[in-house]
From Swiss-Prot:
It comes from Mus musculus. Keywords: Ubl conjugation pathway. Residues 91-137 form the F-box domain. It comes from the Eukaryota. The keyword Iron does not apply. This is F-box only protein 36. Substrate-recognition component of the SCF (SKP1-CUL1-F-box protein)-type E3 ubiquitin ligase complex.
Length: 188
């Protein structure tokens, strides 16, 4: 399974805590941690300061409390915990699957489970709210999808259409049809 992993497992950039304006990058690869920093200052003594870089193996990072503190100060303890997990070989394989495959899997979940999954990460939030997923859900729950339904879904989105009850859906479809008929009469 580790062969599925890309070379770069995680990357984050950020600014140091106030009053610092320094810029930082943390890059986790399959074999090492790379911590980079750029000194940002208006003071003349820092104008010629070169960017810095520290490279450590995963094992060395787990023993380097100084670098761990720097990561926690700049990026927070949640990021530090995540980096610990990556260094210990605890990878989030599910998150790394292709969107297409994840959408196929998510289609089989109950609506409550989809709602819960959407709260786990920004990637799953995007997928769980995507029109592609909700179009598949609507297709699996409806016998037929009419052209009017497709047109309505194009305007309001498949998720919103699914969540709208049948009476409202029929009313909106009728209003759209009336508007189209009125426009056709005006053009004639």
């Amino acid at each position: 399974m580790a062969s599925w992993l890309p070379e770069t497992l995680f990357e984050i950039v950020g600014q140091g805590p106030a009053p610092s304006k320094d810029y930082y990058q943390l890059l986790i690869t399959r074999t090492q941690i790379i911590f980079r920093w750029w000194k940002i200052s208006l003071r003349s003594e820092y104008r010629s300061a070169k960017p810095g870089e520290t490279k450590e193996s995963h094992e060395d990072f787990l023993d380097n409390s100084h670098l761990q503190v720097q990561v926690a100060v700049v990026f927070g303890t949640k990021i530090l915990d995540y980096v610990f997990n990556l260094c210990e070989g605890k990878f989030d394989y599910l998150e790394r699957l292709s969107d297409r495959l994840l959408l196929k899997i998510i289609c089989y979940l109950d609506l409550e489970d989809i709602a819960s999954l959407s709260q786990t990460s920004s990637k799953f939030e995007k997928l769980c709210k995507s029109d592609l997923l909700w179009e598949q859900i609507v297709q699996s729950t409806c016998d037929t999808i009419t052209p009017d339904m497709r047109a309505l879904a194009k305007n309001m989105g498949w998720r919103q259409m699914f969540l709208t009850n049948n009476i409202q859906l029929q009313r909106q479809t009728r209003k759209k049809k009336q508007r189209q008929e009125n426009q056709a009469e005006k053009l004639a």
